[in-house]
């Protein structure tokens, strides 16, 4: 082998040139391979960690002004409200080419009466009582008039007597009927600040018109109710045995149940919930739903950390959920977002009766979730709410067609679907082809991929660069190897003939010719690999994919945890490549060297001397 190396050193310039070229080609080849493997690992990690969620909202056909009377101002007020000519079903999104990972779903939520658990702090009872009262004098209640409370139907109170004075006003009626002294009346009231001039009390009990049922059938149609929209009724002998009297008792019963009501959201997959998708909600203790839980409808649930702490609940405890109402219109956040329980639907059915449970079961707590930003967001803009229970949708095995408290169009917080990452343009093209224009103009689809498009773009560019480096290194290494073997083996036939003439065996000739070339190549390959490792470490410190470019700080973002995981994702096989590639190149050099030497040894000595 030493003689072989000495022969190489007889042409130092050529040997040095091939050595440096082989070193550079190997460095380029290994660097390209490492970058390719590293980038591919990051792409795979991004594909696993990121999802693309689409949300759907039906736009109103128009808005109309709803007017009402304000007795304190002595004038009408106006409020804009949306008008929908019809409700578009989520089924219109089932079209060719959609390629859903998870098909569109319009989520409903249940109302559960949690007797014995802390749900709210009595807001409804304090500000929306049902009162029996007797006027101190006959008067028209277009201003605050003094009355004596006979009793509260809701909330029930101890030691009720007629010495309790309050001031009532038929605040929202332009020409109210008079209240007569000595008679007893019952009314549903709202405690508000008294803005009347010369008011004798800082607060007043504003009379509220009778609740008209918002119950809908299974097709989403509003059921007719014969309730008269009066703000009060006179209480006479036997009044509560009449249909009108039963209304007040049922309303009081429903309001009492409402005080202990919490929302329950049935889940088919937490990946379809926008708050779980954007990581503003995540399970911090216990576990989330398994695929088996969701498919089999296991009686398990997730509750908020705050609710569990407030009620002394922990993982493994069971909570009974009597479900009595179904809201197919809004997300739980619209009513329960801040915990106040202010409703946009009636608690009475079309027969003016309180709803009764259609499904009751005990659910085991398997995890508690932490929620960021439930407060302070516009009502109904997200699906999460205070005291919200999450349960598998398949766990409710009863028909609830008779308990639908409201129905309405698709909203971003209630309707979502999932598509493969990077296919938003393909989806919208199929959507525009297959969904009629008159439907599309009334729907608004919004996508959120959590920054996947920006991150994957940089990674794909980096992979393209890595492939180019790898290809350039591979072609360069092969070309240099061919030239190396040509000059130091193929062109050495005369040398082989002389060595054979001097009595060297064929094996000795093989060693003489090939060993030096193999050693030279091996050393160059090793140095090139070392150089590529240093370069690879330097490249990893650079932001070549643009992942770190932000227009805002993510230091305190929940999503930043996952972004960092992607940025620091290492390919498990980069170390293997730094061994396999040099070894393969060395073996290839040795193999080709032996093949070429054997080919030369087939010639006769005289023939080789003439080469």
State the predicted function of each range.
Residues 37, 41-107, 163-167, 176-184, ...:
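Basic-flanked hydrophobic alpha-helices used for secretion and membrane insertion
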Residues 4, 484, 571-611:
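C-terminal membrane-exit region of the final transmembrane helix in multipass inner-membrane proteins
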Residues 14-72, 531-540, 544:
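Alpha-helical transmembrane segments
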Residues 90, 105-141, 147-151, 367:
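Structural detector for short beta-strands of small beta-barrel domains
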Residues 535-577:
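Short juxtamembrane loops and helix-capping segments at transmembrane helix boundaries
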Residues 13-40, 457-497, 517-535, 581-593:
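Hydrophobic alpha-helical transmembrane segments of multi-pass inner-membrane transport and secretion
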Residues 1-30, 514, 602-604, 610-611:
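N-terminal Sec/SRP start-transfer signal
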């Amino acid at each position: 082998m030493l003689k072989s190396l000495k022969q190489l050193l007889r042409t130092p310039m050529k040997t040095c040139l091939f050595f440096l070229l082989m070193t550079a080609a190997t460095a380029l080849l290994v660097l390209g391979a490492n970058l390719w493997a590293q980038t591919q690992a990051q792409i795979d990690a991004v594909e696993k960690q990121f999802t693309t969620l689409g949300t759907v909202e039906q736009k109103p056909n128009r808005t109309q002004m709803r007017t009402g009377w304000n007795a304190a101002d002595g004038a009408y007020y106006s409020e804009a409200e949306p008008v929908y000519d019809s409700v578009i079903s989520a089924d219109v999104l089932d079209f060719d080419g959609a390629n859903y990972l998870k098909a569109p779903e319009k989520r409903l939520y249940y109302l559960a009466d949690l007797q014995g658990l802390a749900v709210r702090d009595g807001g409804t009872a304090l500000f929306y009582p049902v009162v029996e009262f007797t006027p101190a004098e006959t008067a028209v209640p277009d201003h605050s008039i003094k009355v004596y409370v006979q009793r509260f139907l809701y909330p029930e109170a101890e030691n009720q007597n007629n010495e309790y004075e309050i001031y009532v006003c038929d605040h929202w009626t332009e020409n109210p009927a008079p209240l007569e002294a000595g008679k007893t009346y019952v009314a549903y009231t709202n405690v508000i600040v008294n803005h009347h001039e010369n008011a004798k009390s800082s607060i007043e009990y504003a009379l509220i018109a009778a609740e008209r049922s918002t119950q809908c059938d299974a097709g989403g149609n509003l059921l007719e109710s014969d309730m008269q929209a009066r703000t009060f009724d006179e209480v006479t002998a036997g009044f509560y045995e009449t249909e009108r009297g039963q209304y007040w008792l049922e309303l009081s019963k429903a309001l009492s149940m409402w005080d202990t009501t919490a929302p329950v959201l049935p889940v088919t997959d937490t990946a379809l919930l926008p708050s779980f998708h954007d990581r503003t909600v995540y399970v911090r203790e216990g576990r989330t739903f398994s695929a088996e839980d969701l498919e089999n409808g296991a009686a398990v649930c997730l509750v908020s950390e705050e609710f569990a702490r407030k009620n002394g609940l922990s993982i493994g405890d069971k909570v009974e959920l009597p479900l009595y109402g179904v809201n197919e219109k809004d997300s739980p956040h619209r009513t329960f977002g801040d915990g106040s329980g202010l409703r946009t639907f009636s608690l009475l059915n079309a027969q003016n009766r309180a709803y009764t449970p259609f499904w009751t079961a005990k659910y085991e707590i398997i995890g508690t979730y932490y929620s960021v930003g439930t407060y302070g967001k516009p009502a109904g803009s997200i699906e999460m709410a205070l005291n919200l229970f999450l349960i598998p949708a398949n766990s409710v095995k009863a028909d609830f067609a008779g308990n639908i408290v409201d129905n309405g169009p698709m909203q971003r917080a209630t309707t979502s679907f999932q598509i493969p990452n990077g296919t938003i343009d393909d989806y919208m093209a199929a959507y525009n082809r297959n969904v009629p224009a008159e439907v599309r103009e009334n729907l608004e689809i919004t996508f959120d991929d959590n920054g996947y498009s920006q991150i994957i773009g940089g990674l794909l560019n980096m992979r393209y660069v890595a492939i180019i480096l790898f290809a350039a290194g591979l072609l360069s290494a092969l070309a240099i190897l061919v030239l190396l073997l040509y000059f130091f083996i193929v062109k050495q036939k005369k040398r082989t003939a002389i060595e054979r003439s001097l009595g060297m065996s064929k094996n000795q000739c093989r060693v003489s010719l090939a060993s030096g070339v193999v050693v030279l190549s091996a050393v160059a390959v090793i140095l090139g690999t070392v150089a590529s490792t240093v370069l690879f470490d330097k490249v990893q410190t650079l932001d070549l994919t643009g992942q770190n470019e932000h227009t805002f700080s993510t230091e305190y973002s929940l999503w930043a945890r996952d972004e960092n995981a992607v940025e620091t994702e290492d390919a498990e096989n980069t170390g293997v490549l730094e061994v396999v590639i040099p070894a393969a190149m060395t073996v290839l050099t040795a193999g080709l060297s032996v093949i070429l030497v054997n080919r030369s040894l087939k010639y006769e000595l005289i023939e080789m001397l003439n080469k």
